[in-house]
Amino acid sequence: MSELHYLYGKPTGTADLRTVNSDFIVKEILPFSPSGEGEHHLVHIRKDGLNTVQVAEMLAKFAKVHPKEVTYAGQKDKNAITEQWFGIRIPGKETPAWIELNSDRLTVLSSSRHSKKLRIGALLGNRFILTLRNVTNVEDIISRIEKVSQIGVPNYFGEQRFGHDGKNLVLGRQMLAGKKVKDRNKRSMYLSAVRSHLFNTVVSYRLTHYGTRPLAGDCVMLAGSKSFFVTPEWDLVVLKRLIEKDIQLSAPLWGRGKMLPQGEAAEVETQAMADLTEDCYGLEHAGLEQERRPLLLEPQGLKHEQTSDGLVLEFILPAGCFATSLLRELVDYQDVKELQWQTTLTAETNVVTESNTAAANVSDNGESAS
């Protein structure tokens, strides 16, 4: 992520993120209210130090159903406190006593029956409450908050999408080159990493060379939807819609089909992807269709408060957008939980290396003596 373009220049303020799980709070916002009847149970859960899959498995075991009967709208971080909805299909059975699941790491906030399955992406957005500790140059951060509130930030896919040390991108490229991956969820995750990297590359290239100005032939999206249309030329009517944020500039989620923008915008995207032709080819032949994603991310209700713990940020992002992509424009932060993971991994690797070296020395000594 460090090589991607900063819209306001690299921040001069620094801070620690996720010193403890409560420094990173996420609350899902559903686009509907549970109907109160039906064979699907919607359970609203607060989890601390658990990932989404772990909770889904706990729910399946408790309800005595197959894990495939448990669904969720999106995955949430493990190293955080998150409030998330789960759907469990339990036809013809009484409502389980969900509250019995409560523990020091999991709390059932509410539950209700619903008539429809909870599907991936069925979210209006997420509310974030982040606490930054050991903050320096807070004046620069606050100045950036004001700019971000007006213009937004690059809508990059965050580091989480690519896995630790970018391994999902590496494995995705290996898969596109022919390596077999049996697990369906892993295949999807690896494909998504390659596609997301391509999107980030195009966004960074465009912002580096052209800023946020519109280009002839742009493919623009209707705000709040996935619908889009091409603008061969920017007349005053269309430009007014962009200024009023009724439409948004976009970048490609690559797949098969002809390039959607035209003219100058198409040329810019082609230039940006010039070194990624193998990624493009692989995604086209993986069965993905071309889609678009907004170029910029505009947070709602972005506010800050200085407390005894540090600087607290609160904002709402649309589903599928990353808080860390917003944060990187505000402050040069270090993720404490990620650093702890890296330290543990390095220590474990050193132990294995030392063990292997010792075993090799014993083997060498044995061969010399024989």
UniProtKB/Swiss-Prot annotation:
GO terms, biological process: pseudouridine synthesis; tRNA pseudouridine synthesis
The record's GO CC annotations read:
cytosol
Active site at which residues?
77 (nucleophile)
GO MF entries = pseudouridine synthase activity; RNA binding; tRNA pseudouridine(13) synthase activity
Entries under SUPFAM superfamilies matching the protein = Pseudouridine synthase
Enzyme class per UniProt: isomerase
Which Gene3D superfamilies does this chain map to? Answer: TruD, catalytic domain, TruD, insertion domain
- The protein, known as: tRNA pseudouridine synthase D
Lineage of the source organism?
A: Bacteria, Pseudomonadati, Pseudomonadota, Gammaproteobacteria, Alteromonadales
